[in-house]
């Protein structure tokens, strides 16, 4: 039996509120396990990653521009997503993700097939589609009266719901 052991854990959730509860439960489990084993423990907390704040108006704007750019196999936004570093950004400013496929349907995102597909012309084209969608959405936000305000209002409402 080693005199010392070390573990690293990443705890994620689809919402910041749920994440806080899961973290509390995890700490209780560590405390209980240390009592049962008669050992001490030390916890060093790292960076917390939060869920994304949805802004459907912004997502719709990006999707429409991605379609105009000719992006293939656009997927609708996910209803729930895990925590991510981009979620932390989206707690400060409105953001959105568009998902343009460059891998065959059903390919696991954590696989060698996905990595290999990322080196293809289709993947490089997706960068262009994304850039065109962002440029078009930016132009719409600048040129359409009140559109930026709508995005900001939806962001503020959804941020309140997610805290």
What is the predicted function of each stretch?
Residues 1-163:
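Metal-dependent amide/peptide-bond hydrolase catalytic core
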